Curated annotation (Swiss-Prot):
GO terms for cellular component: plasma membrane. It is found in: Cell inner membrane. One of its GO terms (molecular function) is potassium ion transmembrane transporter activity. The keyword Cell membrane applies. InterPro entries: K+_transporter, K_trans_C, K_trans_N, Kup. The gene is kup2. This is Probable potassium transport system protein Kup 2. Transport of potassium into the cell. Likely operates as a K(+):H(+) symporter. It comes from the Bacteria. The chain crosses the membrane at residues 10-30, 50-70, 102-122, 136-156, 168-188, 211-231, 246-266, 284-304, 336-356, 368-388, 393-413, 415-435.
Length: 620
């Protein structure tokens, strides 16, 4: 009985977190198709054609591509572009495609941030715009109300969303039931609309009106925004609950609502100004606006939490500098808060709300990031099909070719909207890509320089004679290199002429898996003369904790008393090089990021009163 309750609870939670983004798409998808920047005439022929396109887009891009195919490509249970990237880079290591695929994954992560800025803005704006259906006099209040709602949402992030999060599942279940009921009520008035399930209507629409259907694709894709979240959030809930929730509740509710909106438009074409809020009786508009706003906030929360998760993954995979990561729950390790990410998102979202003013204006910006990410996911998963699943090459080409053709069609329909707002996700993607690749390149140059300057450990051990005093206690030297002597140790020897009785050269590494169990966390070897090499491994979904890892060294017969242990860290500063490894502006950007990165002491949870920092100058 308790196991059944747990499954139901997991199912409800999955509905609350995973499907918020795609669940709010009915607020604007059909409206934008018929009244957006390239409006389509509202007549039965076009309504049937668009509904057929929506139906098969949802079935192909979400049900087949993500739910059936890509969700099989988990990285030890985790999903998402960076998890998929880590899996693919491991599979292609040593092959020519390794670097291009890595760059594709980085582009997907960069585009995600553009998407995560647009989602809260368009979701809450489209929900609050329902007030205009009550009376047009409320139109001037839409943007201020949206700003207040979003400000409150971002302000509570530091306190955690555990308590409020318990309401997410039930509220979203109510939302999807409401979508279904509204859809059924309207379909009953025009049941013939269900004939649009046949793909012939989509094909006829495309062949009869090629240009119009091309423009329509740019808005139809809004029906699948958030589809990638099914894969991204797989690590939190598992494959089965997400698939069950999709097939049993979310998919039927979405399709019923879209067909209900289509039935309404056939019966009353003037409802196109806001078909969703016109689906029910007048008395229902205000409660529906309230429920839609709650659903939009939940969709925004899911994206914000996803942005924190991607930031942590990027830090662990060496794509971003160290940032402060706050755990907001003692029970859920996945509930984190990244202050820098939070307030950067907030400022961008506010700029979008104030700058674009309406969901219609924002819709043009939305599609490019989504279609680009979906296209990259298709390319990455093709290598999983071929190298991990060992599918027949003909099957891989057929499946990937079909999915990629659909992705390219939608991407092409959205790229023409650059001037109307599509420039924004491309601009954010470019900035994010520049930051990610500059940090990755800079750290690679630093590692190269450190390796070049490194003194072999055996040379230092031989040089340790009777004249070098041994201080009592333990010295832990943190170093990125797994061989040689850390610069901090050389500086300590040079200036203090002393070495501790026990010296532990410690390297924290990130595995290409999301989690590393405690049993595999540490590996310690005795080098001799009181020196030890310690390797601490974490997954890219975990936050490093060096003192906690030292406790695990008991299995090697070593115990660490924090009061007699000193931690030595190198503080790197960079000087101009005659042969720079990067352009000057990238060197300056890298230096700026290094200067503003969270201190290693804080990031690795090392007691500040036990830390000694020694400066090191490097040319990059």
């Amino acid at each position: 009985m308790s196991q059944h309750k747990n499954r139901v609870g997991l199912l409800v939670s999955a509905v609350g977190v995973v499907f918020g983004d795609i669940g709010t798409s009915p607020l604007y998808a059909l409206k934008e198709t018929f009244s957006g920047h390239h409006p389509i005439p509202v007549n039965p022929e076009n309504i049937f054609g668009v509904l057929s396109l929506v139906f098969w887009t949802v079935m192909l891009l979400v049900t087949v591509k993500y739910v059936i195919v890509i969700m099989r490509a988990d990285n030890h249970g985790e999903g998402g572009s960076l998890a998929l990237l880590a899996l693919v880079t491991e599979l292609t290591r040593g092959r020519r495609v390794h670097y291009p695929l890595m760059m594709l994954g980085v582009i997907a992560a960069a585009l995600f941030y553009g998407d995560s800025m647009i989602t809260p803005a368009i979701s809450v704006l489209s929900a609050v715009e329902g007030l205009e259906v009550v009376t047009p006099d409320l139109r001037p209040y839409v943007v201020p109300i949206t700003a207040v709602v979003l400000t409150a949402l971002f302000a509570i992030q530091s306190r955690g969303t555990g308590l409020v999060g318990r309401l997410f599942g039930p509220v979203m279940c109510l939302w999807f039931i409401t979508l279904a009921v509204l859809g059924i009520v309207n379909v009953i008035n025009a049941p013939g609309v269900l004939k649009a399930i046949s793909p012939t209507y989509a094909f006829e629409f495309v062949f009869r009106h090629p240009l119009m259907s091309f423009y329509a694709l740019g808005s139809v894709v809004l029906a699948v925004t958030g589809g990638e979240a099914l894969y991204t959030d797989m690590g939190h809930f598992g494959r089965f609950p997400i698939r069950l929730a999709w097939f049993c509740l979310v998919l039927p509710a979405l399709l019923l609502n879209y067909f209900g909106q289509g039935a309404l438009l056939i019966h009353d074409p003037s409802a196109i100004q806001n078909p969703f809020f016109r689906m029910g009786p007048e008395w229902m508009v205000v409660p529906l606006v309230a429920l839609a706003t709650f659903a939009a906030v939940i969709a925004s929360q899911a994206v914000i939490s996803g942005a924190y998760s991607v930031a942590r993954q990027a830090i662990q995979l060496g794509l971003l500098p160290r940032m402060t990561i706050v755990h907001t729950s003692g029970e859920e390790a996945g509930q984190i808060y990244v202050p820098f990410t939070n307030w950067t998102l907030y400022l961008a979202v506010m700029a979008l709300v104030v700058g674009f003013q309406s969901s219609s204006n924002l819709a043009a910006a939305y599609g490019i990031a989504v279609t680009s990410t979906m296209m990259i996911d298709t390319i990455l998963v093709s290598f999983v099909m071929a190298l991990l699943w060992r599918w027949n090459m003909a099957l891989v080409i057929t499946v990937v070719g079909t999915l990629l053709a659909v992705d390219i069609a939608f991407f092409s329909a959205n790229i023409i909207k650059v001037a109307q707002g599509g420039w924004f996700p491309l601009f954010i993607g470019f900035i994010s890509f520049t930051v990610l690749t500059t940090w990755r390149r800079g750290r690679a140059l630093v590692r190269k320089q450190l390796k070049k300057q490194a003194v072999p450990l055996d040379v230092v051990l031989r040089a340790l004679g009777p004249n070098v005093s041994r201080a009592r206690g333990t010295a832990v030297f943190l170093t990125a290199a797994t061989d040689g002597v850390p610069p901090a140790l050389l500086h300590n020897l040079k200036h203090n002429q002393t070495v501790h009785q026990r010296v532990v050269l410690t390297t924290v590494t990130t595995a290409e898996t999301p989690y590393v169990p405690d049993s595999e966390r540490v590996h310690m070897t005795d080098i001799g003369d009181g020196f030890h090499r310690l390797i601490i491994r974490y997954g890219f979904m975990q936050t490093p904790d060096v003192p906690a890892a030292l406790v695990l060294c008991k299995q090697f017969g070593h115990e660490f008393n924090m009061m007699s242990t000193s931690f030595f860290l190198s503080r790197e500063t960079f000087v101009p090089s005659l042969n720079p490894g990067m352009a000057l502006w990238r060197e300056r950007l890298f230096s700026f990021m290094t200067l503003n990165a969270t201190r290693a002491t804080t990031f690795f949870k090392i007691p500040t009163d036990r830390v000694v920092e020694l400066g090191t100058q490097l040319e990059i």
